[in-house]
């Protein structure tokens, strides 16, 4: 069974396609546009690749198993969103809000998490190669079993972060922090 198309997904009596068209109009500052509020929307197992969700409200949305490759999610509110096994490769999530989101087993390589709120996010088993976490809040995040190869954690506070079972040998860590010191803490 393939992924669902945006036009077949309904939220608040409208198709997701209509909502995203109005959001794109809003984002470009044109008359008649409306910011997308997809709070609690079920967009699981959907093809949403390359879509513009910049500044959208996606609180508690279910995006599990969805294809979001190359989507624009900068400054989006994904608080508590379900992104389990979602494909987020090469998305821009700069300055997005994701506290309590579930990104377990997500394919999230190449993401910009620059200045994001990732507090208490579940990254267990996620693919996070070449990810930028600079200046992100990752307090309380769980990375157990995640792949953080060549990830950037510079200028990131690692207080309360669970990095157990994570190979940090190629991860760029904050100044003065070593992989050995972090593994002793786990």
Features from the language model and the residues they span:
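Long, contiguous interaction/recruitment modules in multidomain scaffold/adaptor proteins
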Residues: 1-2
């Amino acid at each position: 069974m393939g992924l669902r198309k945006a036009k077949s997904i309904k939220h608040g009596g409208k198709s997701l396609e209509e909502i995203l068209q109005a959001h794109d109009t809003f984002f470009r500052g044109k008359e008649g546009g409306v910011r997308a509020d997809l709070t609690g929307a079920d967009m699981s197992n959907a093809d949403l690749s390359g879509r513009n969700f910049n500044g959208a409200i996606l609180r508690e949305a279910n995006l599990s198993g969805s294809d979001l490759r190359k989507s624009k999610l900068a400054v989006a509110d994904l608080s508590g969103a379900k992104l389990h096994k979602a494909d987020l490769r090469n998305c821009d999530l700069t300055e997005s809000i994701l506290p309590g989101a579930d990104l377990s087993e997500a394919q999230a390589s190449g993401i910009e998490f620059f200045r994001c709120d990732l507090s208490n996010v579940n990254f267990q088993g996620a693919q996070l190669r070449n990810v930028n976490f600079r200046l992100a809040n990752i307090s309380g995040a769980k990375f157990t079993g995640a792949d953080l190869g060549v990830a950037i954690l510079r200028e990131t506070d690692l207080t309360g972060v669970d990095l157990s079972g994570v190979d940090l040998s190629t991860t760029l860590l904050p100044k003065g922090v070593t992989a050995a010191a972090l593994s002793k803490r786990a």
